Amino acid sequence: VIHPPRSLTKWQSTSFTYNMTRCGFFDTPAATGTQTITGLGFRPTFAMFFHSMQTTDGAEADACLNQGYAVEIASVITQHARSGRSQEGGIAGSTEYGSGASQTLCIRGNTTTTTLNLEAALTEFNDDGFVLNYTTVPAAATRVFYVAVLIESLGVGIIPSLALPFGVSTPVTGLSFQPQMVMGMHRGSDSCNLGFGTPGSEFSMMSRNRDDVAFGFSPEIWSSTGSVFLSGYGGRDDSVNLTAINADGFSVIKNLITDPRPDFYWLALADTAVSFAAGSFVPPQSGTTTITGLGFQPALLLLIGMQGIGISSAYNNQLGFRNFFGAVDSEGNQWCCGQNATTLASQPRYMSSTSATVRHGQLTNAHTFTFNEDGFDISTVVGAAGTATCAFLAFGARDSSGALPLLGVG
């Protein structure tokens, strides 16, 4: 990580880039209180967190994929967290525990009890990382993955599902900047869902809907190759699209819904010195696939993946990994966190990777990522049957020719 001096100004003739992005992981502490994460080499303004209540690579845990984020805007930290469910018993008649949301936490989750056993809030961004405060910790350590980025302009908010009219483009304004990328997050009946993009280039992931023997099957994944920003939790019966990027916000439209759904949290990003791009790809079964056309060399990829597009069958045709989140950065950090199921009769299980590979499909598929000047290369470490589709959000390194905020590093 290159730390530019404070005196650097954008009129200097030498142009270079420097990374203000990082992904990594940490394990939850044994006791409540503060935990300081260091080693980033810069002061982030935005951090996302993912976990599935377990630590060992490939381990199974009876809890769902959870996610949250924290942002700093005008010295004020705002954070949201969504937790999916844990369950016990067989697929039919499973009991749901702990699903929900928080507007005061960035990390939230539970195992097979009705009591939350992991709660943490981000209390400070500093020159080398961030500080978390735990009010509840699990008996066994949980591995939490994070993505941290310095972004110049950020906006956050909540759109109540019931307040969003059906079929009408609804503006979200008051940001004081024009977003380059918009993200959305909400909780499905099982797990947490994430979407990102710009109008006409939207990508979303969802978990399966709740088990119900009356239906005879479990709708699995709703994802998009470029047309849905946020999809709901009952199969494909709930979706929201971005319809416009405005000078001080964006517009959304609810175009498919059958009954009330969870509110969704949104996050808008813009930066005069950072490039953004979103897209999708199918990881290769063997060899290397090159993705180009981004127009810049990435410094960070945020990945959301699923075993198919719009699949609606018992446990995703039993292909394995139902959905996952992952991240890759230019420091060589690569990780994956998600959930899987092997057969209709099995419980959902969860795993993660902390090695230098992005794993999916019950660890039967593994890939490494390297960045090129116009995109990235995906190389197969382990390939197996079953096609996964990945959507990505790419962040470029900061460009010294753009406007520079105070970095807080010397």
Regions found by a protein language model. Give the residues of each.
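Surface-exposed molecular-recognition determinants
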Residues: 14-410
